[in-house]
Amino acid sequence: MKYRDLRDFISQLEQLGELKRITVPVDPKLEMTEICDRTLRAGGPALLFENPVGFGTPVLGNLFGTERRVALGMGRDSVAELRELGELLAFLKEPEPPKGFRDAWEKLPVFRKVLSMSPKVSSSGPCQEKVLEGDEVDLYKLPIQTCWPDDAGPLVTWPLVITRGPNKERQNLGIYRQQLIGRNKLIMRWLSHRGGALDFQEWQQQHPGEPFPVSVALGADPATILGAVTPVPDTLSEYAFAGLLRGSKTELVKCIGNDLQVPASAEFVLEGFLYPGDMADEGPFGDHTGYYNEVERFPVFTVERITHRRNPIYHSTYTGRPPDEPAVLGVAMNEIFVPILKKQFPEIVDFYLPPEGCSYRMAVVTMKKQYPGHAKRVMMGVWSFLRQFMYTKFVIVCDDDVNARDWKDVIWAMTTRMDPARDTVMIENTPIDYLDFASPVAGLGSKMGMDATNKWAGETTREWGRAIAMDPAVKTRVDEMWSSLGIDTPE
């Protein structure tokens, strides 16, 4: 599905029956979370709350609440088509030299398409139709959700944060939640290894004492939002990747108060600075783990200007115990991750992030085992190859006769092919999500790899069991006679 911006995407979702307009007044404080949570768990539509209590701006929720809508947001009609997108990213991440003239000719359209999707910079855009500065800046006028009863306050949950480090041409795009603490102040919660935080650190080193410019787009088009959470090769900008998804160049506009470029069609843009030493306690907030997180200090984002479209729409979400939108995104992203992993490890058959595992904390891998110890190599590869899996605590590796997406299969393999002492790998003092309160130290914890593959000579001295399977000829005969047996079985 191709679309121009968030509004066009909303319109097309409505035509497909994938969006519901809610005209009943609903409070952004808690009520929207409960409604979106029930809707997501039922596989329901995106929701456009047209009458948020106390506000005149509609709120869009549950946009990526199903795998299909994630695929539609990426310009595809089904989740299965995301596998092709992963193959493209795998190729761009590590392009192979052409094997000859014919191969070079066949690859030329791919490179031409990528080069043709460089973003287009315009002199003006819809996101700057209205400009608020000085005392007009009041974030309390936005219908920012308070998601859970013990949250510290309203939380901006889908901010596309745009930064640029010193001496860098490429901008960084990231999704970092922001707590509202004043009419023009938000807390920028980013982890130290994230692109935005690294840009800020480099800025402080090269420009000590100077404020760091930041812009935040709210309500960007889905391709740009999803591009910010996809493993895009370092040689490809998120804006160019968004153009590939959307099928048209990403249109950007320069901010009024800094040199950063933001999506021209965004509903809102916040422009401002991080001032050195200006920090605040963030949290607690209910998170994707299903728990409230600890209070930690993060930089304060001072908003000096708000620009927005006429009659803007505020895009929001909540995070909570899975399933939530991050968990749904994780499942859909599986299809993108598989080809990228297979490019480096061709023996991998499938890769799965169970939604119950809080988006990324557990991974199941199936593989064609080729030698003793092979499963352990794949474990290490998952942890090290893509930074998206830096925080994955548990990796289960199974043979290719196991369905990675079926817990019954996985548990069977674990309980019949594993010895806990021999087949468990424990690694201490590794990077862990700061939100993981189970780790002994914030940001530092252990990882566990589980080898649930059949064991080869060298891994065991015992005779290994052979899996039971019925004779195919017998199965065929029983299939043919089944209807005459009169045995009623549930569908």
Swiss-Prot record:
It is a peripheral membrane protein. Keywords: Cell membrane, Decarboxylase, Flavoprotein, FMN, Lyase, Manganese, Membrane, Metal-binding, Ubiquinone biosynthesis. It catalyses: a 4-hydroxy-3-(all-trans-polyprenyl)benzoate + H(+) = a 2-(all-trans-polyprenyl)phenol + CO2. Mn(2+) binds at residues 172, 238. Binds 1 prenylated FMN per subunit. Pathway: Cofactor biosynthesis; ubiquinone biosynthesis. GO terms for cellular component: cytosol; plasma membrane. SUPFAM superfamilies: FMN-binding split barrel, UbiD C-terminal domain-like. GO terms for molecular function: 3-octaprenyl-4-hydroxybenzoate carboxy-lyase activity; metal ion binding. It is an enzyme of class 4 (lyase). GO terms for biological process: ubiquinone biosynthetic process. Its cofactor is prenylated FMN; Mn(2+). Prenylated FMN binds at residues 175-177, 189-191, 194-195. InterPro entries: UbiD, UbiD-like_C, UbiD-like_N, UbiD_bacteria, UbiD_Rift_dom. Transmembrane segments: none annotated. Belongs to the UbiD family. Catalyzes the decarboxylation of 3-octaprenyl-4-hydroxy benzoate to 2-octaprenylphenol, an intermediate step in ubiquinone biosynthesis. Homohexamer. This is 3-octaprenyl-4-hydroxybenzoate carboxy-lyase. It comes from Alcanivorax borkumensis (strain ATCC 700651 / DSM 11573 / NCIMB 13689 / SK2).
